[in-house]
Amino acid sequence: MSDIKLFQLKGNSVTELAGHAVKLEKDLQFHVESNMEVLLGVRFLATEYGTGKTHKGRVDSLGLDENGCPVIVEYKRHSNENVINQGLFYLDWLLDHQAEFKLLVMEQIGREVAESIEWGGTRLICIASDFNKYDEHAVQQINRNIELMRYR
């Protein structure tokens, strides 16, 4: 598990910014999406992406990492909100709807990038204020590329 830390650069000086809880999950999502490439190394593609009538959900953020792997980012303010289960649900949806994601990449970035999507490295990033020991253990047991990130 990793923490997201922010720093302010002034000339040759670097200062870590103090962390604080966000009031709303949407605030956290907005800040990460606005800086996704810098914070996560992921190119932002879509926010609140609808999963259709069958799944009836919305993926918080979709992106593509520097290796061409699809990335789902799910956000929660608190640790007890089943972010991992929800993320796995959307990960399953994404792997079942590769053509739809490929079309999104084609529209946002271009055909060449869409043709070289690396599905074997599909990632799920769960961002929350904290995770419990059961979350951390569960992620180790699941044979998927899942990252837990705490914000402060």
Where on the chain are the PLM-derived regions?
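Charged, terminal alpha-helix-loop-beta segments
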Residues: 1-152
